[in-house]
């Protein structure tokens, strides 16, 4: 496969009557979209966009994960346009800047974005000509919705129009513009082609981990390339996709839909694991569960898998069908991953970036290695550039999934694409079997005055093991304004329920005692020298990544 039209058509041919999406339309009311119907609706919407003059144009999409979001994105691709997915958490000024920088001429939007979209249309600063709601009913007359467009497209196809089928797709032309995380003015715009993303989908399909019998719950935002490409994988594999009613309803949704797989960030699994661990603690079952884990693991080595039966109660709490979780976008807690695997839910970690469409490496269900992000997926090469005495260096990659560059920023493109290799900006090492391990971002490394390097992610992993930790970050905070002599500083967000009746000073002393234990097993130069404790959540991106620079600014400015 080279393009999305081929992918969608092949899925309709292979899985025609199978359900591609199940949509909730009220309490106890559901509507199924088959693969055949999905293809028909993509063709109809794509035809309507061409008829309105948007063939090959840049069109933005903003809103929560939904079937209509997928439909709009697929139609834009199939009509040869350029999709510009935007983060629904953007402030108005950031949203406006994204519209201006990407030069989109139309936008699909969700109900919650209506005010910002109307304001942007009226500003005169963008090139927007049309705004199409992803909600509403056909023919209400006030606005042309996605449903109105589909209706028009159906009529055009019925009357013999075939623009959507006859259009030649250049798979190597820019088809998606994605903003990297960071402040909007500093973010780069990644240019991906249909070939880039389809090549990545094909590589993941060759891992043979998703099947037509699977039900996927779409958790990662579609504007994030991990979530977006993950959805294309589900469509290529013939799986069914459902949508979450909100994270507090996640486990009930698992049971409601019989969810068997999802793509997510470690925070989701770690939250689930903490609930399981809390239940085990309350029932005084620690020793019993530990023994059962050892027992099940031992039989597993003999290729006898009894995990789902031994831990049936945990499986039931996860809906009864959960078998696979694909994790990415952040480092995962090794103990959490090991425990979930023991409970019968295989958690595999992947690694990649927006610029790589995104997946570069992944564990395989039969090749798990604690702490690693697996081996390169088929079609991808990876290596360590200029490794130090510990084998740590920058991770480089090449393959058909690598972006063609940053939009409007040739200098930044030349910085990362050198001699056919993409410089990820991540530091890591590779073991003798080709498994990769991430030690941190180059830009996050704390360089001490003595020249020693502290990788904050390593310390954060240790701190995250403490039972009351909600989230934490380790930063190099300038000592009295001296950037060349940073203090290794921990900021920790704690669970208030864990310290009921304690004063702030008492909480600090308890945390400090635990951190000192971590320091005792850490080389002197790596030790945490300053601690900040708070119950206030940190500033994060919509995918749950802590905005390190903004947190550092708060500390330097004395806001903590």
Tell me the role of every PLM-derived stretch.
Residues 78-152, 496:
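Structural core segment of the AMP-binding/adenylate-forming
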Residues 262, 306-436, 442-445, 470:
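Conserved AMP-binding/adenylate-forming
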